[in-house]
A protein has these predicted regions:
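C-terminal cap/linker of serine protease catalytic domains
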Residues: 1-16, 76, 121, 125, ...
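Catalytic-histidine neighborhood of serine endopeptidases
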Residues: 2, 40-85, 94-95, 200
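A conserved glycine-rich beta-strand in the N-terminal activation segment of trypsin-fold
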Residues: 6-14, 23-44, 72-75, 132, ...
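Gly/Ser-enriched beta-turn/beta-hairpin loop segments
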Residues: 18, 81-85, 91-99, 128, ...
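Residue-level recognition of beta-strand microenvironments
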Residues: 26, 41, 79-81, 136, ...
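Catalytic nucleophile loop of clan PA
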Residues: 37-38, 118, 164-184
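Flexible, gly/ser-rich surface segments that form the specificity/activation loops bordering the active-site cleft
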Residues: 51-57, 80, 105-110, 115-154, ...
């Protein structure tokens, strides 16, 4: 036991450091908007639709700024967003010839999640860069009860977790014990209940955007 806790503490710190390499801050001008995750080495960033939207779901601007873990500020353009899925895809602009060192996150298997499994969410709550919070999976899938605005459900796929998400976590990664992406943190459904869009839904959305499918705002 005396060695177990120090080892666990070290492992969790290393895991947070690993995930933090793929975590970015997304902003529109001077206004901090939320978090995002580097999805591919060519500059795709995934976040929540509400992070890149103004009041009433209106698009803030097609131009955004993405701040990397090292503090580099890069221009990015909004490729597409889906308000129903609460997902958006940005593309880091490299027209100036820059080649930023991007660290895309590894995808996990969100369909294999089970209640009781350990997860970690990362983001920028209260302006704290790369803050981490951990918990366990409560449930996952599309068969969760519908509690309208008070909880998960509505026939959508969700990952529901026992941890306290804060506004700055929106758009940030939810990862498993290997640091693999299993969801994008989206909202709170209760005092200590967080909700995330599963990784397989994210991957499907990105594939449709890259294939040029229409129907996205």
């Amino acid at each position: 036991m005396t060695k177990l806790l120090p080892q666990l503490n070290s492992d969790l710190g290393e895991l947070a450091d690993l995930v933090r390499k793929s975590l970015v801050q997304v902003s529109a001008g001077r206004n901090g908007a939320g978090s995002g995750v580097i999805f591919s080495s060519d500059g795709l960033v995934v976040t929540n639709a509400h992070v890149v939207s103004g009041k009433g779901g209106r698009r803030r601007t097609p131009e955004f700024q993405v701040t990397s873990p090292s503090g580099s500020v890069m221009a990015a353009k909004l490729l597409a967003k889906d308000d129903d899925l609460d997902l958006a895809v940005l593309k880091i602009d490299r027209t100036d010839g820059s080649t930023p060192d991007l660290h895309p996150i590894e995808l996990g298997n969100s369909k294999a999640l089970r209640p009781g499994q350990w997860v970690m969410a990362m983001g920028h709550p209260w302006g704290v860069a790369g803050a981490a919070v951990a918990g366990i999976v409560i449930g996952a899938g599309d068969d969760l009860p519908d509690h309208s605005s008070e909880g998960p459900g509505g026939g959508r796929d969700w990952v529901v977790v026992d941890l306290a998400l804060r506004p700055g976590h929106s758009g940030g990664p939810l990862v498993d014990h290997h640091g693999r992406l299993i969801g994008i943190s989206t909202m709170m459904a209760g005092r200590e209940v967080g909700m995330a869009v599963p990784a397989h839904v994210i991957q499907g959305f990105v594939e449709k955007v890259l294939a040029g499918e229409s129907g996205f705002s």
